[in-house]
């Protein structure tokens, strides 16, 4: 993999160069404005291109080191693109209302996420029949409300290492929280926005649907590049590895997952998965997980259970994705 490539023509076709009406501008964006046409500011794409590349590199580097990226875009035209890009790259997103304290009061947000999980369990299990129709509707409404705000971060497991923002004016609270915690911010900054405090500023139109889709696609591909780099830098000799046999009797675990009683041959070095420490590897081993293929075969529910067991539910999807890649290449 490599950083996603893009051209100035793509930016032009997506309308990235169109700013706001000249009387609505923020003077702090003057250096990124090429000029005005029909009272509309035109963004200097000669600056957008290298600044976008810089942001993509930073995002790829963050993920390659095991970091998490949070996509933030709550305006109507950004909601679908933000959610799709985050899901495609196994990251996290907020595309509805930003709840104040999402970053700075993570403990309280975690409590709300636990409530969301509880409601999911109740409504998706046989226990729901114990409630009246009215009670089930009340629980469903509460669940839907929480899911709109927290569904994209319920598996994050902790604070993100970088946030990517569409429309810095609308998401100013999210940016302020990130700045307060020292979390880097990559953002699309239009001509009516204040660039102050944005770590990786990308001048561009933050309203056009095609432009937003292009930004999100590039960021998602940069994340995937980071995941690929993390695998490549692990030093695993894939050509010398082979898929181990699985005929030994497994040991039952509290999670419902059946692990192995011991490694089949030489165990894989799970620490080479991005973000897995020695302590996490030991927890995997205690659960009977010694090989990449075991992680690769986890379904979504079991993966979440395993993530809860090792204390990092928000990271397990990335590990499963990496393990699938390694297993497929080994075959």
From Swiss-Prot:
GO biological process assignments: translation
GO MF annotation, one: structural constituent of ribosome
Pfam families: Ribosomal_S2
Gene Ontology terms: cellular component: cytosolic small ribosomal subunit
Database matches in InterPro entries: Ribosomal_uS2, Ribosomal_uS2_bac/mit/plastid, Ribosomal_uS2_CS, Ribosomal_uS2_flav_dom_sf
PROSITE patterns cross-referenced by the UniProt entry: RIBOSOMAL_S2_1, RIBOSOMAL_S2_2
Keywords, alphabetical: Ribonucleoprotein, Ribosomal protein
Similarity comment text for this entry: Belongs to the universal ribosomal protein uS2 family.
Protein name as annotated: Small ribosomal subunit protein uS2
Species of the source: Rhodopseudomonas palustris (strain HaA2)
